[in-house]
């Protein structure tokens, strides 16, 4: 697994809950070191957060000015608009399995591969539109 800090990486994660593979993006800050523990932001619709929102640049700026503590970003991109309906919508056919993937499998992957704080208040879920509703509904 590539832990080069300061760039967005992609890794494939097998989900037994969803019976499929997810390409997950992650960003380690330029100052990343396994010697420190990090908060985690999990973004849904992550390709939009990285490409248009440049979330990694914002996090770097906020860390530098000490407005936030050390943070890594992990994101789940959506392959299509139709996919979002099935996974993010509470009535979607894959919604419950996706909640299980995020809660158990994705969080386990994050904690097993990165130096993270393992407390509920050290995690943030975020998304836009339907992904934002999903984030709020899984808290």
Predicted region positions:
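Non-catalytic cap/lid and distal C-terminal segments of serine-dependent acyl enzymes
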Residues: 1-139
